[in-house]
């Protein structure tokens, strides 16, 4: 099994950057899932790394805090968000929530595809 820190060191993924400071990067990654559904927690396997544009949260980033806490409990390896598409920057409360549980938030640069 690969770990998130190993995934982020793959040459084609080195442009992905950590958003929050208190993130545990030694989380196992079993799968990578792409989703835009707000009820994703019901449909993803444990130890997945989720990539998203966070379109469903553009009007209410507070819901991202709830998602982060749910994903952390699953457990999930982390959340990659393509900032600049629907959300330009994360609300500080979202980052604080992720930091409070050591949950990795990863920025996916706007010029990279999610596929």
Protein language model annotation of sequence segments:
Residues 1-115:
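Alpha-helical/coil-rich non-catalytic "connector" segments in signaling and regulatory proteins
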């Amino acid at each position: 099994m690969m770990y998130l820190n190993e995934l982020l060191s793959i040459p084609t993924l080195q442009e992905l950057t950590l958003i929050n400071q208190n993130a545990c990067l030694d989380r196992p990654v079993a799968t990578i899932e792409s989703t835009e559904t707000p009820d994703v927690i019901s449909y993803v396997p444990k130890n997945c790394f989720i990539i998203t544009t966070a379109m469903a949260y553009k009007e209410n980033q507070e819901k991202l805090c709830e998602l982060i806490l749910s994903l952390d409990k699953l457990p999930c390896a982390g959340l990659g968000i393509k900032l600049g598409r629907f959300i330009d920057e994360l609300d500080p409360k979202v980052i604080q929530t992720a930091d409070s549980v050591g949950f990795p938030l990863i920025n996916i640069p706007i010029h990279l595809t999610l596929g």
